[in-house]
């Protein structure tokens, strides 16, 4: 197992103007980024980064600073598989040459970090790539973008950083991974930390969900305890249906059967046959009830895989005209899946979950939760409830979104579906 340094050391080094190495989850990019605070950018730091990385230097910024500086997305529909939010590239308008040298890029980076800067201080396009970090940092998205901004903020600096992926010295056509990153960090006296450790550190020191109320909910599957939560970022309310003692027989919160269910008004409430959401919710409650211990976490704000109810209905119109569920979203200028599981992970932690068996047919959901310090020991499939109205939708989820759905090829489609 690769030796990692403390988050405290990384924060101190960032504050002192040094670079650090940050590695993400092996199931995600499994790469290490060189990171330093943008306001501490010097020609020497930039030159060092260019020498040992891919050279595609990016500057993660808080969302409010991106808005203030007029940094629009590079593309209206973000198709990056990890959701990295690239904005238009920039150069400082004054005081630099062509913009590509280490000195020029350092000047642009410092200007991006300056709270007094305005959109008029930059030219577009340029040689520096700003990135928009999610509010809430690694607790919302476990990526290098958010990790770098979090480290800058923890160091008492502006929420602006510089990041780039470290290239392998053994194979220059590949990126360096954990063991080689440890050697690199030691050779250059740099701290090596993981995003998982940063998440754990922040979870110990901060809280981003609030438990508001609890009440018993008798259902056809038995009596659950409904625990209501809100987020400090928005007014969206979530509810966890809890059955039994989550701490378990050993009091450790391990091996909990969990379903993280995305809100679906049309399927869960109206019984729409266009999706399988209602039957999945019912099956999850039934499986937890049979287990006698578990959680069905109902995530509001996930309607239509996160695009909202009105956009979902518009997507249905496009599907009726022949588009599939993925292309319908994309035609509306929306991502195929905009869901964020960070708050759900915090709720599960608050409920005492340490490890779980996750009820899902969607492998991406496992990755979305696994990066938050929750150990998923097993993915438990849910029964597939196919019908003539949802069969095309299910096949698209299987073929284009990687869902583990079997036995779909023998079902006929409804006329016009």
From Swiss-Prot:
UniProt keyword Zinc present: yes
Amino acids binding Mg(2+) 2: 29, 144
InterPro entries: DHBP_synth_RibB-like_a/b_dom (IPR017945), DHBP_synthase_RibB (IPR000422), GTP_cyclohydro_II (IPR032677), RibA (IPR000926), RibA-like_sf (IPR036144), Riboflavin_synth_RibBA (IPR016299)
Molecular function terms from GO: 3,4-dihydroxy-2-butanone-4-phosphate synthase activity; GTP binding; GTP cyclohydrolase II activity; magnesium ion binding; manganese ion binding; zinc ion binding
Catalysis: reaction(s): D-ribulose 5-phosphate = (2S)-2-hydroxy-3-oxobutyl phosphate + formate + H(+); GTP + 4 H2O = 2,5-diamino-6-hydroxy-4-(5-phosphoribosylamino)-pyrimidine + formate + 2 phosphate + 3 H(+)
Active-site residues annotated for this sequence: 337 (proton acceptor), 339 (nucleophile)
Domain of life: Bacteria
Residues binding Zn(2+): 264, 275, 277
Cellular component terms per the entry's GO annotation: cytosol
Cofactor(s) listed in the protein's UniProt record: Mg(2+); Mn(2+); Zn(2+)
Annotated stretches, region: GTP cyclohydrolase II: 205-417
Keywords attached to this entry: GTP-binding, Hydrolase, Lyase, Magnesium, Manganese, Metal-binding, Multifunctional enzyme, Nucleotide-binding, Riboflavin biosynthesis, Zinc
Keyword Kinase attributed: no
Residues the record marks as site: Essential for DHBP synthase activity: 127, 165
Cofactor comment: Binds 2 divalent metal cations per subunit. Magnesium or manganese.
Coiled coil region boundaries: none
Residue numbers binding GTP: 259-263, 280, 303-305, 325, 360, 365
Gene Ontology biological process terms from the UniProt entry: riboflavin biosynthetic process
Pathway: Cofactor biosynthesis; riboflavin biosynthesis; 2-hydroxy-3-oxobutyl phosphate from D-ribulose 5-phosphate: step 1/1; Cofactor biosynthesis; riboflavin biosynthesis; 5-amino-6-(D-ribitylamino)uracil from GTP: step 1/4
Region (DHBP synthase): 1-204
Assigned EC number: 4.1.99.12, 3.5.4.25
HAMAP family from the UniProt entry: RibA, RibB, RibBA
Similarity-based family: In the N-terminal section; belongs to the DHBP synthase family. In the C-terminal section; belongs to the GTP cyclohydrolase II family.
Function: Catalyzes the conversion of D-ribulose 5-phosphate to formate and 3,4-dihydroxy-2-butanone 4-phosphate. Catalyzes the conversion of GTP to 2,5-diamino-6-ribosylamino-4(3H)-pyrimidinone 5'-phosphate (DARP), formate and pyrophosphate.
This protein's name: Riboflavin biosynthesis protein RibBA
Organism listed in the record: Mycobacteroides abscessus (strain ATCC 19977 / DSM 44196 / CCUG 20993 / CIP 104536 / JCM 13569 / NCTC 13031 / TMC 1543 / L948)
